Amino acid sequence: MEKISRTKIVDLMKREDFGAMVNVKGWVRTRRGSKQVNFIALNDGSTINNVQVVVDLANFDEEMLKQITTGACLSVNGVLTESVGAGQKAEVQAREIEVLGTCDNTYPLQKKGHSMEFLREIAHLRPRTNTFGAVFRIRHNMAIAIHKFFHEKGFFYFHTPIITASDCEGAGQMFQVTTMNLYDLKKDENGSIVYDDDFFGKQASLTVSGQLEGELAATALGAIYTFGPTFRAENSNTPRHLAEFWMIEPEVAFNEIQENMDLAEEFIKYCVRWALDNCADDVKFLNDMFDKGLIERLEGVLKEDFVRLPYTEGIKILEEAVAKGHKFEFPVYWGVDLASEHERYLVEDHFKRPVILTDYPKEIKAFYMKQNEDGKTVRAMDVLFPKIGEIIGGSERESDYNKLMMRIEEMHIPMKDMWWYLDTRKFGTCPHSGFGLGFERLLLFVTGMSNIRDVIPFPRTPRNADF
């Protein structure tokens, strides 16, 4: 076979030098035709679009042609030709074909459609489908957008540890890391495990957030962001929860809650705009195949300012809805941690645009959030989105050493684990703010997928750690 430099299909579709010899490589999506001519849809993953390879059967070995089945991997040399078919600008008239890899007839991805549940069982193969090819290309582009946004704004990308001895959220739902023999654990007289001989000499876990360490960096570098994996050992089998997911967490010195809200709104609009501008084919495919309102919803986020509303006002709106006959599964009252149905009512039914809810009761928020003058609420903010509910959670951080100490004691957090965090309030404290965005929740919104397990390559959920 003549050696010709490979052209990615995404680039081939932009070429207009018809008559040129080209090489394309990829996997067979479909093969159809007559006794004289076959049409092979070839895809290499660079785009949602296939290239049509036209094969004059008289010019090729019959035994080789038998190997060209759905899923087979081919290298094709041929002439780039202007296509007469609808929906494609160019096709390749095959001159030489090499089968790089045959595909066994047990290949589970055939032309017929497959359920999402089935595709999760074969997560190692599902990136080959149109749907997951689109999702994972968008995932890549969203990661690029995140780094680009923060770099352009002068933030520093800061790497926080995956293994930690602190519980940022105070929830205690952490995966433990140990080298100890689980069948022969050393315990003290109270029956508590002794970690002196463990690898780190203390109890260690996988991180639930890089925020606390991010705050340390922000009080030195000014503006930082983290972007990495986080872990929650919650036994939650829902379409919105994963045990392993990715988080983006900016922290900014001297920003108060207002600037924090401004940053969150600007950031998420940037990401949505990036998806529309740079993933148009993939977004359109997902809009047409899964969620007919996807593009309209994405464009809607960009059109208007987000509503900014105190938690107390949000509760009043929800209580008025109940009084008028609206039924929620979970009760509404001041002090409740809002459920997704409450958040979505505010966004989808009442305001019909994204909402930033602020000033939450301190009892339902984390210890590090700055307390308001009323003593009841904290300067927290949650960004609520249509279809998703909460997509961003953040706050202005408590910068007063004594108030932070008091809050840590109130929540019975061991002081021995917090000395390093308190040092930032002891040595040149400053106002600072930040937030966390669950990457997969952003992807749920941008792709229109309905289950968070379908926007991460290999989902980690209770009783599932395959691949």
UniProtKB/Swiss-Prot annotation:
Subcellular location: Cytoplasm
Disulfide bond sites: none
Presence of the UniProt keyword ATP-binding in the record: yes
EC id: 6.1.1.22
Pfam families membership: tRNA-synt_2 (PF00152), tRNA_anti-codon (PF01336)
Reactions listed under catalytic activity: tRNA(Asn) + L-asparagine + ATP = L-asparaginyl-tRNA(Asn) + AMP + diphosphate + H(+)
Gene3D superfamilies in UniProt: Bira Bifunctional Protein, Domain 2 (3.30.930.10), Nucleic acid-binding proteins (2.40.50.140)
GO cellular component labels: cytoplasm
Top-level division of the source organism's lineage: Bacteria
Family classification: Belongs to the class-II aminoacyl-tRNA synthetase family.
Subunit structure and binding partners: Homodimer.
Protein name per Swiss-Prot or TrEMBL: Asparagine--tRNA ligase
Organism from which the protein derives: Bacteroides fragilis (strain YCH46)
The gene coding this protein: asnS
